[in-house]
Amino acid sequence: MSLLPETKLDVLLAHHASLENQLQSQVGADTYVKLMRELAELNPLIEAVKAYRQVGAERGEIDALLADAATDAEMRAMAEAEHAALEAQEAELAQQIRVALLPKDAMDDRNVMLEIRAGTGGDEASLFAGDLFRMYEKFAVLQGWSVEVVSASEGTMGGYKEIIAEVKGRGAFAKLKFESGVHRVQRVPDTETQGRIHTSAATVAVLPEVEEVDVDIKPDDLRIETMRAQGAGGQHVNKTESAIRITHIPTGLQVMMQDSRSQHKNRASAMNILRSRIYDAEQQRIDSVRSAERKEKVGSGDRSERIRTYNFPQGRVTDHRINLTLYKLPQVIAGEALGELIDALTTEHQAAQLAAQGNAA
């Protein structure tokens, strides 16, 4: 008995063959690039399907051998051991294919608008926000992505009260989307003379970079104000009105941008951030309803949820959504072991999707 619907596998193989045939015909440069990209995404799945069918065929041969009364005891014992190994391999490939066939988030391949804000904890929270930004920056470099700071408000003792950066790279949102939420740190500050552990927090928001066609924003729904940029002490640092504040009246969402001397650039940056926030606000509303129905631990969309604790004295990082603790805090903060947490969260999310499919079937 097949563990997967064979008709669906036939359709996949036929689609793959069709793409390869199209690639051999005369197509334009844009179509060629599109076909190559789709084939590159599909190839690992097709390889798994072919391996699954090959293992199934081999298991069928062993079944026939075991069903043959003429098979002697020694051969039967060898066949049974081989049958068990093939069954396990077949089940593993079937699970791999099921995961690959799960519905993809339409935003997974988008760039990311990463927003980090210091929360409770004063200067220590700002320092922690800086640590988190550098962690994501180093992780991005390891992925081959680029990071560009869009806006930053530095803390009094270092770090950031708020920092917004654009992370550009294939699959950036897919990897980082589960990082949204409250991150908590427990450590002894440099200024602490009694050796007491302080707790502070920072909030991370990971928003997919959306285009104008993704969000319908009516010009009448925007209030755009210009002003002179201000420094840390409130003094004006620019003689021209280059700073921009844009308010989306229906939602009350507001973005202020003054990092560039160019009003045009500040306005473009503010609109990019505003589009992402409007889209994200609607997705949070949808996700909160869905997660309440499914009782999902990962991807609930709740930004007020404490998702992770970084305990420096114990050298551990705990993700509270999946009860996973890694005693690799230096490696996580360095961006090197962050992928282990991200992979575990992705696996948990996929398991929830598979369970939902099973319940719906």
UniProtKB/Swiss-Prot annotation:
Location of this chain's protein in the cell:
Cytoplasm
| Coiled-coil positions | none
Lineage top rank: taxon? Bacteria
Keyword check for Endoplasmic reticulum, yes or no. Answer: no
SUPFAM superfamilies xrefs:
Release factor
**Matching PROSITE patterns, A to Z?**
RF_PROK_I
**Residues recorded as bearing N5-methylglutamine in the entry:** 235
Question: NCBIfam families under this entry?
Answer: prfA, PRK00591.1
Q: Which family does it belong to?
A: Belongs to the prokaryotic/mitochondrial release factor family.
Give the protein's function.
Peptide chain release factor 1 directs the termination of translation in response to the peptide chain termination codons UAG and UAA.
Protein name as it appears in the record: Peptide chain release factor 1
